[in-house]
Structure formats: C-alpha cells, structure tokens
Amino acid sequence: MTNDALFPKVGVITDIRKDTPDVKTFRVVGLDGKKMFEHKPGQCAMLSMPGVGEALFSITSSPTNEKFMEFSIKKCGCVTDWLHSVEPGQKITVRGPYGNGFPVDTDFKGKNMLFIGGGIGLAPLRSVINYIRDHRADYGTVDIIYGSRSKDDLVDFKEIEEEWKNEPNFNV
C-alpha cells in the first residue's frame, strides 16, 4: 500500500445492479471516467460520503478490468442504507486499496482452487475468482461451493450461472 491510498479520490457511481433484495453492486469510476486505482485480488477500499459516514468494502471486480471497480454491498447500516438509496451519477469518495490481497501470482499458480462462501461472503472472493478466470491457463481446477438462505439471496447468481459455470474446469 502506498501513501496515495490514504488520500480520498472523488468517484462517480455509474451503474447500480440489484443482486438480491438487500444486496446491490455499485460500479464506480473516477471523475475522468477511468478506473480510480489499481488493486490486487482480495483488496478493499473505503467508500464515504461527507455527512453520512464511511465504510470499508471488498472490491469485487477483477484487477484485470481496466475500466471500473465494483463493490457488492449488503444493506445493513447507516452508510449502506444511504448507498442503497442513491442513483447512478452520485459522487462518492473512495480511498484505497487496502489489504495485502491474495497471493494469486505466487502461491496459487498451477494449483487447484477451492472457494467456499455464503451470502455476501462471496464478495471478497469474487475478485479472486474472476482474476483466475481471466488467467485461466495459469491455474488448475476451480471448485466453488456457495450457498445462501434461498435462491433469491444468491449474490451474483447471474454471473455464476452464465459465466462461471461455462468455464472449463470450473465447478459451481
């Protein structure tokens, strides 16, 4: 992490996707319309709005995506309630990236992968899974065990059904 991560940058929410009754995925870019900063799989960022508060969220988009960052956020508090009420075009402050991320380029290469997540717990794993999908030749079989209270509570279900299940050696 560089000191640059400590300084807030103004971003814009360009798209909001409702994944479940209480989870939305927010697509964020900088004021210049570009990805705000580089990140590693598994890192997070601080999202804030003056007068509302701030909270740390997993970056769910793959680091190989050069256009934007995404955050899948469950409605469960002051900041998340506010986020769930905004519309595309809303400006927001972003700081990061934070955390070390996962050692995908060193410890994981050439190995079979097992991911286990439930509900919103898939969010921090999503960037890792998509990174591995983007670099498919570097990794072995990928097994994903994912559950939720009901099918309606499966975060990113469309991505799982339409993209991950169709990847070679991806078992969901």
Where do the language-model regions lie?
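Ferredoxin-reductase
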Residues: 2-90, 148-150
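FNR/FR-type flavoprotein reductase catalytic core
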Residues: 4-5, 78-172
